[in-house]
């Protein structure tokens, strides 16, 4: 009998921007690396350097100057399965150093994902990696678990997609889930664009990573956008400097809050969509009138794009303006929200009551990939 340590389930949250992976029962992911596959732009001239045909994650990131970087996941949906397989392979063998055929694997997916997508995930886990068991869970539901609630509305905003998912007593309400294809990567692109107006040019995939870092370190959300713009015009209090990898120092001011303002005003990037506050409100309004009060009182933020300072206050202000005046509104922004999907997965996969929920290899062999729709909902 293998001891329990050997058969710890693996939890892998495949985000558009970052993969978060580790062992069920841990309180944080062991491996966090970019969901990038890089291929050399030039053929190697140095003999014996042992060039690879593809690099994954941090290694691709560190060699980005000579690589073309591709993200296999776009807007939360896997668009390139060969590259995705490389990422999973890297996760299991290089990052976690485990044999996937010895561990059950819990994967995550965005809500409203195409059915074919989860079937393909299931197929790859069982046929390529020979896992003994697997499960696919919806990201936002896991975030709510991690916050210790069973009822609430989760605004999950990552690198590729944002969505609002109302959950009542542990069940997601699919008719009220709203998806917004506006997230961290669009903010990075917008920051690249507005920095160009300042005379700084960022164009390549490698330079995009620099701008992403700048966004993460310097951006914040204004409580009152117009007032903040006025302040920025008259004083230099919002200006901050940032050092580029080559030592050049650039200054950014109003761009710091103009960039994430797109979340509330998607028209900035030419999108005809409601902002995250309005999407959250619309999502609540699609729910039964009796449960709305519970949702307004438990608005939970999750994902890396909710890490901007000032987001909870602004969200609270905007939703208060939309909701009935007597309604008590509470926006919860847990400090670990960058990883709350993974943490929720870690909690779920280690529950004794969850153990009968896994899809076993035998069940897969009998029913094929479509079993995922019956067992994971």
Swiss-Prot record:
PROSITE patterns registered for this protein in UniProt = ACTINS_1, ACTINS_2, ACTINS_ACT_LIKE
Q: What are the coiled-coil residue ranges?
A: none
Supply one GO molecular-function term.
Answer: ATP binding
Which InterPro entries does the UniProt record give?
Answer: Actin (IPR004000), Actin/actin-like_CS (IPR020902), Actin_CS (IPR004001), ATPase_NBD (IPR043129)
Q: Which SUPFAM superfamilies match?
A: Actin-like ATPase domain (SSF53067)
The reaction(s) catalysed by this protein are: ATP + H2O = ADP + phosphate + H(+)
What domain of life is recorded for the organism? Answer: Eukaryota
Cite the CDD domains for this sequence. ASKHA_NBD_actin
Instruction: Give the record's GO CC terms.
Output: cytoplasm; cytoskeleton
- Indicate where this protein resides in the cell: Cytoplasm, Cytoskeleton
Pfam families membership:
Actin (PF00022)
Entry EC no(s) = 3.6.4.-
Key words of the record: ATP-binding, Cytoplasm, Cytoskeleton, Hydrolase, Nucleotide-binding
Which family is this sequence assigned to? Belongs to the actin family.
- Kindly give any further remark recorded in the entry: There are at least eight actin genes in rice.
The entry's function note states: Actins are highly conserved proteins that are involved in various types of cell motility and are ubiquitously expressed in all eukaryotic cells.
Instruction: Report the PANTHER family cross-referenced here.
Output: ACTIN (PTHR11937)
Q: What is this protein called?
A: Actin-1
Natural source organism: Oryza sativa subsp. indica
